[in-house]
Amino acid sequence: MSLQWWRDTCREADPQMRRRAAERQDRLTKPRGSLGRLEQVAIDLAALQGRERPSLERLWVTVFAGDHGVVAEGVSAYPQAVTGEMLRNFVRGGAAISVLARELGAGLEVVDLGTAVPLEALPGVRHLRLAAGTANFVEAPAMGAEQCLLALEAGRESVRRAEQAGSQLFIGGEMGIGNTTAAAAMACALLDAPVSALVGPGTGLDASGVAHKTAVIERALALHGAHRADPFETLRRLGGLEIAALAGAYLACAQKGMVALVDGYICSVAALCAVRLNPACRDWLLFAHSGAEPGHRHVLEALAAQPLLDLGLRLGEGSGAALAVPLLRQACALHAGMATFAEAAVSDRPA
């Protein structure tokens, strides 16, 4: 395994299929452009899948979990034990993403990269447990270099399993108490933006809690700020095991030619890191929604992303991405199933 495998070449979209899909859209029985962004979504998927009529029948959902040492600074409204407790909920079918994956006919993989509280072996959970959570990043780097590399590789391996299953779309989700703090710190470093613009309530902090969270991140940036220009160092110093796995998954999707649907704030920060590690992966990332965390908008703008939904979501788990899948499927169905003007014997407008 190359220590910097993420620099490997990404697959390219098929320009011929993009052209053919665009031509088909222009021949369908509707005014050109009348289906708005659904038309471009179908065209983009055609180019990425190399098929004039793309399909999203087979989905893969992985939730990556990991705890964060910065929780010791009092930055979360919930105790750290919740991370492990939610793993049980995921595999027992009671979490939001469990319900949504079931409704979509998608399998759900759960990967424990580093819960702070050891868990019993749970059927349906891959217990990698690279560490008992990250270190407190106001005192030291969140991860060692080897831990970060292993977490990136865990994301890559999840995509490999998705590919072997014949999946056409990858959704990554996350679970980790304290991970909005890590995501905000990473976003500040990667965007060179003020902390106040990128920090929000996470799982439910009040105004004083947000102010404290802001101060904690400012301390972390003061400690690690000299490494802002290096996305790998930013990831390992300020990120989390699950965030690294997400970044690795997005990079692997681009290298294998699988579309990734990016969820909320934390996933979008992981995507931003992936793009900084290998800019060519950007074409393979679709963005599901614009979430309630104030920093999410800034990250999406930096990625020139056009999210599909805006529902005020802030749950994570991959839930927002799962909610956007029916929209993508309908875009594909319209593109493939509508008749052309010639097929329907309907008069087109004059050329």
Swiss-Prot record:
Keywords: Cobalamin biosynthesis, Glycosyltransferase, Transferase. Its EC number is 2.4.2.21. The keyword Transferase applies. The active site is at E317. It is an enzyme of class 2 (transferase). Transmembrane segments: none annotated. One of its GO terms (molecular function) is nicotinate-nucleotide-dimethylbenzimidazole phosphoribosyltransferase activity. The keyword Transport does not apply. Catalyzes the synthesis of alpha-ribazole-5'-phosphate from nicotinate mononucleotide (NAMN) and 5,6-dimethylbenzimidazole (DMB). This is Nicotinate-nucleotide--dimethylbenzimidazole phosphoribosyltransferase. It comes from Pseudomonas aeruginosa (strain UCBPP-PA14). The lineage of its organism: Bacteria, Pseudomonadati, Pseudomonadota, Gammaproteobacteria, Pseudomonadales. The gene is cobT.
